[in-house]
Curated annotation (Swiss-Prot):
Keyword ATP-binding: no
Name of the molecule in the record: Enoyl-CoA hydratase, mitochondrial
Residues where N6-succinyllysine is found: 101, 115, 204
Compartment(s): Mitochondrion matrix
Annotated pathway: Lipid metabolism; fatty acid beta-oxidation
Keywords, comma-separated and alphabetical: Acetylation, Disease variant, Fatty acid metabolism, Isomerase, Lipid metabolism, Lyase, Mitochondrion, Neurodegeneration, Phosphoprotein, Transit peptide
EC number: 4.2.1.17, 5.3.3.8
Positions bearing N6-acetyllysine: 101, 115, 118, 211
S-S bridge residues: none
Subunit structure: Homohexamer; dimer of trimers.
Location, primary (coarse class): mitochondrion
Modified residues (Phosphoserine): 114
Length: 290
């Protein structure tokens, strides 16, 4: 905790007062977690909600927390009723960064041989859409974790930063890559080289955040978006997510070819037929995820 306070004091910009988040219900599967809280939400329990829950450490991302996060993600990924996932933090911090105490005494050999931080990548492999609902600090690994999600909603007082430079290192979980793709080279370079934080408003203007919400309604608005996504065909949603993500990995020509392939693939699904039939018949589609 002391190390986190030192890091927070180094990140430039005024500190914000804490805000309160709503109470949470236990995970439906009965799993016992130490560092997260997970549950199903939405009118028909179609949304998986995961809350990072290390408030005394400002949700510092220790190995145990990441392991539990991966377990909850796997459970929701395998649940046929869940169509989208919301990832959020606490009242003061989404996540203030990686756990510095776990990293302090690591050597190059330790990092290389253990593929340090490799287990963070599981979030990027989830096929169901994941929405980050960010209140408070999203610093370092917390900012990287949010950027691994497909959509970012931010509370009005949220702040984003990559302050690793201030403790003698650089982002190691995709920060230099995803931040640059999201906000462009100039702002990303400034944030990475100075450790400066940006506000939710600046993050939205730069393209990092898609929506700013009142603090009190942030999570519920993210859940509403997730419910809307979950109401569509899950198999087609997965195809759409894959196609959009390909834009960051492929050339325009390659990405367009993949898009066409996935577009054609929807014509092999019952849901495509149902969706177009429902449109012609002027009724709501009844997707079966087939």
């Amino acid at each position: 905790m002391a190390a986190l306070r030192v890091l927070l004091s180094c990140v430039r910009g005024p500190l914000r007062p804490p805000v309160r988040c709503p109470a949470w219900r236990p995970f439906a599967s009965g799993a016992n977690f130490e560092y997260i809280i997970a549950e199903k939400r939405g009118k028909n329990n179609t949304v998986g909600l995961i809350q990072l829950n290390r408030p005394k450490a400002l949700n510092a991302l220790c190995d145990g927390l990441i392991d539990e996060l991966n377990q909850a993600l796997k459970t929701f990924e395998e649940d046929p009723a869940v169509g989208a996932i919301v990832l959020t933090g606490g009242d003061k911090a989404f996540a203030a960064g990686a756990d510095i105490k776990e990293m302090q005494n690591l050597s190059f050999q330790d990092c290389y041989s253990s593929k340090f931080l490799k287990h963070w990548d599981h979030l990027t492999q989830v096929k169901k859409p994941v929405i980050a609902a960010v209140n408070g600090y999203a610093f370092g690994g917390g900012c990287e974790l949010a950027m691994m999600c497909d959509i970012i909603y931010a509370g009005e007082k949220a702040q984003f930063a990559q302050p690793e430079i201030l403790i003698g290192t650089i982002p190691g979980a995709g920060g230099t890559q995803r931040l640059t793709r999201a906000v462009g080279k100039s702002l990303a370079m400034e944030m990475v080289l100075t450790g400066d934080r940006i506000s939710a408003q600046d993050a939205k203007q730069a393209g990092l955040v898609s929506k700013i919400c009142p603090v009190e309604t942030l999570v519920e608005e993210a859940i509403q978006c997730a419910e809307k996504i979950a109401s569509n065909s899950k198999i087609v949603v997965a195809m759409a997510k894959e196609s959009v993500n390909a834009a960051f990995e492929m050339t325009l020509t390659e990405g367009s070819k993949l898009e066409k392939k996935l577009f054609y693939s929807t014509f092999a699904t019952d849901d495509r037929k149902e969706g177009m039939t429902a449109f012609v018949e002027k009724r709501k589609a009844n997707f079966k995820d087939q």
